Regions:
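Perimembrane helix-loop-helix junctions
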Residues: 206-243, 247-251, 419
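Aromatic- and kink-enriched transmembrane "portal" helix at the membrane-lumen/periplasm boundary
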Residues: 100, 132-170, 174
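Hydrophobic/aromatic-rich transmembrane helices and adjacent perimembrane loops
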Residues: 160-161, 358, 362-395
Length: 601
């Protein structure tokens, strides 16, 4: 009776959509761990500048400027042809760059749009909604979350890689629609989307290989010619984009040698270098970054700081995959499954090859056995399709064995446990970025609350947080973004390596406690040349700070004697900031050792 009820439930037309919906909820929760990380790479300056621009420019002017930039690119006035690229182009999507959480959720939205379209394209190409659902449930677990956040497009670069893959997937869907209807508009749309992908990021050129695999799967014939004919539409868009790309490079080179007016620039990092050993090494290392556990295995990362949310996400996502596997009654043929695997391999290897031939990444600094570069996230889509094909092979193998009915429950539990463990391991490892995110947040909130306003625009403000490695332009952009002030900002690490003769210097620092409720930032006037001690200290408390907490610090007298102090917050002068935080003024004492300031619960 119970078995019949179970079959009735799983046989319902709503069962598969519900499983996919559950997978989406827990997949989003799982991947949203990326919101804990600070900005990395070029985001540290681009996001600040672009958000300041969008908040100080009328929206119509933003649209007009963006349109002019696209036309400028189409007129071959840019060294690289990327009219549809996200960063560093300033457009309306710059609104999503101003907050760590919003920015990462913006990237996650692009990623899940790609997941949904990949699953849809898989279902169309294989003529199996269940295989599409399997791809949808598997793909969230395929991304390598523990990687250097400066080059992982789950964290950085405004979803550049994801926004390149999305029009490729749309081109594929339009291509298949053209096959069904023979209406030329679908061929034109397919060509346009492929043109758009190649004009977003150069890895777009490599995806024609994967689209060929999709076309061959869909035509289902034993001959290659129908698939090649179907690929004419997206290939034409790619060829047109390639012409613009080469034209832009030619104009740039002619300017560099003085034949054309204007100043050309060196774009050597995106020009090919065909040193075969270097290409193969970089190619393989970049491909390895597309596998979910590769970085943690090579980095010898152990699953620590595991929280209940990690376990819940792992169990739920694994259960969704197992539910779809249980529904797979009709398996694709061996040839179809091989084509699916090779299509995934093309999605994995083709973008990695473009990185492999670039001299910028052949030096072993940006790409190694633990870290890949930007395309690694979209490479994981290929790993996901390969995993779907591997599951089909395993199902075909075990379903023909006499022992399968007896061992099926045990094998299913072991498989689910392995997938759940992968999720738990990845999510807990990604939490290692949390302290960096907390530091960035409390530091930014302090500046936003006006902590450094008293210093004005002339007095140097030396910051403990090194924005973009302490770059002066980035430091200034940070204050423009969060305080709307043209602050004379410097990095403490850089300041201490230089000679300065300013009479008054302020130091802006921060201290992380045991959790977010005890994080603080502070400003004081330097009392020594090395900025170790400060006077006239004001402390910023975030709105979630413990109101019953105590500020602890150490003072250093002129004779070098240090004394520890504690001040209950209730006994200190407090001013409410507009962002919900609180500014607390410490009483005048001997100079305070800045690194000792902390909030205790």
């Amino acid at each position: 009776m119970e078995r019949n009820n179970l079959k009735k439930i799983t046989g319902s037309r709503w069962f598969l959509p519900v499983v996919c919906a559950v997978s989406f909820v827990f997949g989003w929760w799982y991947l949203s761990i990326t919101t804990c990380a600070p900005l990395g790479g070029d985001d540290e300056i681009i996001n600040l500048q672009n958000y300041y621009y969008i908040t100080h420019t009328p929206w119509w002017q933003v649209v007009l400027t963006h349109a002019k930039e696209i036309l400028n690119q189409l007129a071959l006035q840019s060294p690289r042809f990327r009219p549809f690229s996200s960063p560093p182009v300033r457009s309306l999507n710059s609104w999503f760059l101003g907050d760590l959480v919003v920015y990462r959720l913006y990237i996650l939205a692009w990623t899940y749009a790609d997941i949904a379209l990949t699953a849809w394209l898989t279902a169309k190409a294989t003529h199996s909604k269940k295989l599409g659902a399997l791809a949808f449930c598997l793909l969230p677990m395929m991304f390598s979350l523990w990687q250097d956040a400066t080059g992982n497009s789950m964290y950085s670069y405004g979803a550049l890689a994801q926004s390149t893959l999305l029009p490729v997937l749309l081109a594929g869907l339009c291509m298949l629609r053209w096959q069904d209807t023979h209406h030329m508009r679908w061929a034109v749309l397919s060509a346009f989307f492929m043109f758009m992908a190649c004009g977003t990021f150069e890895i777009g050129f490599t995806y024609i290989a994967a689209l060929f695999g999709i076309a061959w799967l869909y035509t289902g014939s034993g001959k290659v010619l129908p698939a090649l004919r179907l690929c004419v539409a997206p290939l034409s868009g790619e060829v047109i984009s390639f012409g613009f790309n080469m034209g832009s490079r030619l104009v740039n080179n002619l300017r560099r040698v003085g034949i054309l007016e204007g100043q050309g620039i060196d774009i050597g990092g995106v020009s090919p270098n065909f040193d075969l050993p270097a290409v193969l090494r970089t190619w393989v290392m970049q491909m390895s970054a597309g596998f979910p556990l590769n970085a943690m295995v090579f980095g010898k990362i152990k699953p620590t700081n595991v929280q209940i949310s990690d376990v819940i996400c792992g169990v739920a996502l694994a259960a969704c995959v197992m539910a779809v596997l249980a529904l797979l009654d009709r398996l694709p043929t061996r040839k179809e499954n091989l084509l699916l695997f090779l299509t995934g391999l093309a999605l994995l290897s083709a973008p990695a090859l473009l990185i492999g031939i670039s001299p910028k990444y052949q030096d072993g600094i940006n790409v190694d056995w633990r870290h890949g570069y930007i395309p690694q996230t979209v490479e994981s889509f290929g790993v996901g399709l390969m995993a779907v094909a591997v599951f089909v092979v395993l199902l075909r193998f075990v379903r023909g064995k006499n022992w399968w009915p007896k061992l099926r429950p045990v094998c299913s539990v072991l498989l689910a446990a392995g997938m759940a463990f992968s999720v738990v391991w990845q999510r807990s490892a990604a939490r290692s970025y949390e302290k960096g995110g907390r530091a960035y947040t409390v530091f930014a909130e302090g500046v936003e609350a006006g902590l450094a306003d008293a210093a004005g625009t002339e007095t140097p403000v030396v910051t403990d947080y090194p924005v973009w490695g302490g770059d002066l332009e980035a430091e200034n952009a940070f204050f423009l973004r969060y305080a709307d002030t043209d602050t004379n900002a410097h990095s403490l690490a850089v300041w201490r390596t230089e000679s300065h003769d300013e009479a008054t210097v302020c130091r802006l620092g921060f201290a992380l406690g045991s959790d977010k409720r005890t994080d603080i930032s502070w400003l004081g006037t330097a009392a020594d040349d090395n900025l170790d001690t400060v006077t006239g200290v004001t402390v910023y408390l975030p709105k979630q700070a413990d109101p019953a907490g105590t500020l602890a610090y150490t003072t250093r007298a002129a004779d070098g004697i240090e004394t520890e102090h504690t001040q209950p917050l209730a006994e200190l002068a407090q001013t409410k900031a507009e962002n919900g935080g609180t500014l607390v003024t410490l009483p005048e004492t001997a100079p305070i050792v800045g690194d000792t300031l902390r909030l205790q619960s």
